[in-house]
Amino acid sequence: MSDNSKTRVVVGMSGGVDSSVTALLLKEQGYDVIGIFMKNWDDTDENGVCTATEDYKDVVAVADQIGIPYYSVNFEKEYWDRVFEYFLAEYRAGRTPNPDVMCNKEIKFKAFLDYAMTLGADYVATGHYARVARDEDGTVHMLRGVDNGKDQTYFLSQLSQEQLQKTMFPLGHLEKPEVRKLAEEAGLSTAKKKDSTGICFIGEKNFKNFLSNYLPAQPGRMMTVDGRDMGEHAGLMYYTIGQRGGLGIGGQHGGDNAPWFVVGKDLSKNILYVGQGFYHDSLMSTSLEASQVHFTREMPEEFTLECTAKFRYRQPDSKVTVHVKGDKAEVIFAEPQRAITPGQAVVFYDGEECLGGGLIDNAYRDGQVCQYI
């Protein structure tokens, strides 16, 4: 058995069960483990309660239980500058951003990784459900987590080869119930703590209220594609392509009772387009354009790739042809796709391997740009 005691692994600990078990497994495998709690957001609520303080207490309890040193580090400025400003700019531009992708790229695997290196880390580890496989020449491949329902490679798709070289994902070969069981067997205080949801580091706040603190709402008209006025919308930033709830129109406008969906936006005129039917024509597209395209391994400047892709988290893979030129790509779908949303990530896969991805700029229907921004 190899001696891991000389290998230092710095674990990003959130106070949740996944990162707790990550630290536990590495400690059991004999690594020199240090736990780090990242404070990335000032989340004091109206009652003066800071959930980060509660989470840090959980980190302290687990670190003490498994016998590892721990520290807290503040990345609020980095998060604001690198993730939150981007998040607001995307909403201003009528897009629907995915802050978790940017948070992993800029905070968890950049600011945190850089900090870990100052502590003498050989690797960093997180509680993400993903796997890394290392070739003999040192190349690292990022693979899907074994738990298909929890696989998080979609959110890790912007990581570079250099970042992956320094990363371990100890939970990648486990399913979520197994992780909880390990936590319970070890008597970890976080064993029954519920999973966090909501925006990366912002938590479970009411999204509409939260966003209105930073961006002024700009109500406008809600129209059908053929020009019928359906009332007022609350502000384009509150709606995403393909959304059903929150429109307030129901079946009161005559015709059939099929549900209404957001089928388009016009930022220049502040119009929200709505239509009836899950597969409304305006929601379907045959290709997309992406920018900030990036691969986890070295690739040529220009090439064509046949692979599968995801256009949102937990979506089944779809067959695509990808024409890459620099950091841009045209992605052509084998079958029409529904609600391709500007600002979201498109992520490429070859079987189990996550190859990388980009951010969706526009969707096209038979060569015509869809009115989604």
UniProtKB/Swiss-Prot annotation:
Protein's UniProt keywords contain ATP-binding: yes
Reaction(s) catalysed by this chain's protein: S-sulfanyl-L-cysteinyl-[protein] + uridine(34) in tRNA + AH2 + ATP = 2-thiouridine(34) in tRNA + L-cysteinyl-[protein] + A + AMP + diphosphate + H(+)
Record site: Interaction with tRNA: 128, 344
Main location: cytoplasm
Record's protein name: tRNA-specific 2-thiouridylase MnmA
Active-site annotation: 103, 200
Record-listed E.C. numbers: 2.8.1.13
Disulfide bonds: 103-200
NCBIfam families: PRK00143.1, trmU
Start and end residues of each stretch annotated as Interaction with target base in tRNA: 98-100
